[in-house]
From Swiss-Prot:
One of its GO terms (molecular function) is rRNA binding. GO terms for biological process: translation. It holds the Pfam family Ribosomal_S3_C. PANTHER family: 30S/40S RIBOSOMAL PROTEIN S3 (PTHR11760), SMALL RIBOSOMAL SUBUNIT PROTEIN US3C (PTHR11760:SF19). This is Small ribosomal subunit protein uS3c. One of its GO terms (cellular component) is plastid. Residues 43-118 form the KH type-2 domain. HAMAP family: Ribosomal_uS3_B (MF_01309_B). The keyword Ribonucleoprotein applies. It is found in: Plastid. Its main location: plastid. Disulfide bonds: none annotated.
Length: 216
């Protein structure tokens, strides 16, 4: 049987970087790791709640966390930050205050910044969110995938593979459907490949969306 490895973990140190950067004593390591998870979940929930309704998705590509002795630096990479900023101009300060209070950071100052990514639809997380919104609105899965591939091609990607698994279009038997365009070298470590796995809850049950994007 073929063993499937996470494409991002497979390329750490070559084309992928860690999303959390800090040192910790072995006894405190698990606590720090859980804190990172909670910070990411909290930010995702906050953005989901306060994003402009018309946008339909959060548009978060990734959240990077760096910890020093006196500072926790959180960078939110977003495709469409204006949707959040238009709704709540003071949103970042409010998020920072709430997060500081929630996690009781002690001596560490919390600093949050938002960075806009150049080509949002060249990012698999944002693309997966786009497909998820389409599926929730009962758009045909094939139509949703084709539109996502078009958007990815406009973002100058060299190849993309989209896979959806579950009770597609409400069918009784779960199945896996996938479409690939261009080159997607999943076994080449040197290949700059980005990946996202995204669950979406529809009226028929949970569907799993996986996207591989070959950048260069």
């Amino acid at each position: 049987m073929g063993q499937k490895i996470n494409p991002l973990g497979f390329r750490l140190g070559t084309t992928q970087d860690h999303h959390s950067l800090w040192f910790s004593q072995p006894k405190n390591y698990s606590e720090s790791l859980q804190e990172d998870k909670k910070i990411r979940d909290f930010i995702n929930n906050y953005v989901k709640k306060n994003m402009r309704k018309a946008s339909g998705a959060e548009g978060i590509a990734r959240i990077s966390i760096q910890k020093r002795i006196d500072l926790i630096q959180v960078v939110i990479f977003m495709g469409f930050p204006k949707f959040l900023i238009e709704t709540r101009p003071q949103g970042i300060e409010e998020l920072q205050r709430t997060l500081q209070k929630e996690f009781n950071c002690g001596n560490q100052k919390l600093n949050i910044t938002i960075t806009r990514i150049e080509k949002p639809y060249g990012n698999p997380n944002i693309l997966a969110e786009f497909i998820a919104v389409q599926l929730k609105n009962r758009v045909s899965f094939r139509k949703a995938i084709k539109k996502a591939i078009e958007l990815a091609e406009q973002a100058d990607t060299k190849g993309i593979q989209v896979q959806i698994a579950g009770r597609i279009d409400g069918k009784e038997i779960a199945r896996v459907e996938w479409i690939r365009e261009g080159r997607v070298p999943r076994q080449t470590i040197r290949a700059n490949l980005d990946y996202s796995s995204y669950p979406v809850r529809t009226i028929y049950g949970v569907l799993g969306i996986k996207i591989w994007i070959f950048i260069d």
